[in-house]
Each structure stands twice: as structure tokens, then as C-alpha cells.
């Protein structure tokens, strides 16, 4: 195995560099705490080490070393459970919660990124062993670019058009455009809502998009991201000041009502545009319709 020290080191470096990039903190601010980052960096190092030794172990016919991959898979599933449990507990103390769909998406991402690290380390080490160090560098760069692609994902601006609409009252009823949001009877609460509230209409670009934004978890993710960046003008025990998203049953549009501390509609539109499309919320009913048409045809 001493002949493979440099390939293994190259694979570990490529894997941990990829994990560090994928660990960057954005406006959603998770993970924010240093100890949480240390945990994920340590797991990334383990994943990189496992990926780097796969090819040398196979070439040396050390097949028992491959069994450690099963232990790694179990460990990374535990990471997913850890993230889910931690975020669920944290969510109960948020003024505007993430929602279980958003939390599950984050947990899946943290598990899957460890597998990306294993793949990066494996490919880099293999390129070094069979070709050269320059081939290993190219392999590492390709894996890094793939990681960037996986990090970006799809966002709401890809599936909806977003328009700012000032909230209004019709009697006690709060409306965003022509979509009824909720009933507010107290005049002082109505005044606060008109002063601080913002409304947005999300118009789906196709039928699949309409089915996706109808998901309650996807709507909650929108409310959380806007409130997380711009703040929220409310405290616990004030249901009349709760951000809400409601759907127009006729055309599939979604109205979003928020009460931010910072009243800046243009920034809010940018935030909503960059809300991730949650994997568990994506629906593609037209694919079923197309397949049914093929069967019938």
C-alpha cells in the first residue's frame, strides 16, 4: 500500500476540498455554529479517506477494506437523522418555522454530500493511479464542478413569475390581489398590516409548476426564507401577524403575505426567486399524462 500513498493523499485533499465548498453558509444560515461545522468537516474527512482507499484496496486484493463502506453508509444515514432531529427541535423556537419538508431536504443534502465526497476521492485517486497526477487534478476539478451544479439546484424563479402586490382589506378580509388570505377584525391590527405587510403573487409557468407550489412545505419554505432575511414583525401569541401563503383554486396562483421588519419589496422578490425548489415538493403530473397518452395511442 506504500506505493499508493500519494494517490490516497491526492484523493483525500480533493474530497475534503469539495466538502468544504459544499459547507459554505448562505443567507439561510445553517450551519451557523462552529461545532456543527467541525462535525461535518470530520465526517467529510472520513468520507474522503474511505473513497481514496477503495481503488488501492482493490488493486492489492484487500477486499475486507471495502466492507468499511457499509459502515460508512450507516454512519451517513445517522448524519441525516441527526440533522433532521436537530432542525426539528430548533424549528419549534422559530417565529416562522422551516417546515418538515424543508428540514427533510436539508437532511438529505447533508447525507448525499458525503457520498459526493467519496466519489470525488475515488475518481481522483483512480486517475492518479492509472494515469498521472495531472489526470488526478483534472478529475478533481470535474468533480468540483459537478458539486457546484448539485449545490445550485433549481429555484422558484425557474418555475414561477413573481409580482409584488400591496395587501388590501375588504371589510375584515385581507386580500393579496383577489386571493383571500385571512380575517382581521381589529382596526389596529389592520393598520399594522397595511403599514408593514407585503404581498406577492406567484404565477406558475406550467401545470407541473402549479402542482409544485401547491405543496404546503414549499410554501412554508418561502415564508421562512423571506422572514429569515428581512426579519418578521411579530412575536409569539399573535396569530393575526403570522405570514401566510394561500392558493387560488381556479388558476393555481399562490399569494404570499409577509410582515418583514425591513420593508423592501425588491429584495423580497429576489429572496423568493432564490428559494430552493424542494425535492419532496416537486410534482410532474404531465409526465403521467404523456405516458398514458402513449399507452392509449
Swiss-Prot record:
The gene is yphB. The chain crosses the membrane at residues 3-23, 38-58, 103-123, 128-148. It is a multi-pass membrane protein. Keywords: Cell membrane, Membrane, Transmembrane, Transmembrane helix. InterPro entries: YIEGIA. Disulfide bonds: none annotated. Its main location: membrane. It comes from the Bacteria. GO terms for cellular component: plasma membrane. Pfam families: YIEGIA. It comes from Bacillus subtilis (strain 168). This is Uncharacterized protein YphB. It is found in: Cell membrane.
Amino acid at each position: 500500500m506504500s506505493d499508493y500513498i500519494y494517490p490516497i493523499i491526492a484523493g483525500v485533499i480533493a474530497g475534503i476540498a469539495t466538502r468544504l465548498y459544499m459547507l459554505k453558509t448562505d443567507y439561510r444560515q445553517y450551519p451557523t455554529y462552529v461545532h456543527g461545522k467541525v462535525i461535518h468537516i470530520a465526517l467529510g474527512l472520513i468520507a474522503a479517506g474511505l473513497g481514496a482507499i477503495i481503488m488501492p484496496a482493490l488493486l492489492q486484493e484487500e477486499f475486507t477494506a471495502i466492507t468499511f463502506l457499509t459502515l460508512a453508509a450507516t454512519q451517513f444515514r445517522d448524519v441525516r437523522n441527526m440533522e433532521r432531529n436537530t432542525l426539528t427541535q430548533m424549528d419549534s423556537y422559530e417565529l416562522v418555522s422551516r417546515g418538515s419538508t424543508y428540514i427533510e431536504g436539508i437532511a438529505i443534502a447533508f447525507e448525499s454530500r458525503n457520498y459526493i465526497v467519496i466519489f470525488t476521492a475515488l475518481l481522483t485517486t483512480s486517475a492518479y493511479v492509472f494515469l498521472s497526477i495531472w489526470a488526478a487534478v483534472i478529475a478533481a476539478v470535474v468533480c468540483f464542478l459537478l458539486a457546484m451544479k448539485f449545490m445550485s439546484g433549481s429555484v422558484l424563479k425557474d418555475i414561477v413569475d413573481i409580482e409584488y402586490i400591496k395587501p388590501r382589506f375588504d371589510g375584515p378580509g385581507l386580500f393579496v390581489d383577489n386571493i383571500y388570505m385571512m380575517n382581521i377584525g381589529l382596526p389596529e391590527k389592520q393598520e399594522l398590516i397595511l403599514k408593514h405587510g407585503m404581498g406577492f403573487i406567484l404565477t406558475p409557468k406550467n401545470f407541473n409548476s402549479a402542482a409544485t407550489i401547491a405543496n404546503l412545505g414549499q410554501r412554508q419554505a418561502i415564508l421562512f426564507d423571506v422572514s429569515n432575511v428581512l426579519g418578521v414583525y411579530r412575536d409569539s401569541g399573535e396569530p393575526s401577524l403570522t405570514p401566510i401563503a394561500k392558493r387560488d383554486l381556479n388558476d393555481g396562483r399562490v399569494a404570499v403575505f409577509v410582515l418583514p421588519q425591513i420593508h423592501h419589496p425588491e429584495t423580497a422578490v429576489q429572496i423568493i426567486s432564490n428559494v430552493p425548489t424542494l425535492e419532496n415538493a416537486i410534482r410532474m403530473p404531465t409526465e403521467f399524462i404523456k405516458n398514458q397518452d402513449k399507452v392509449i395511442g
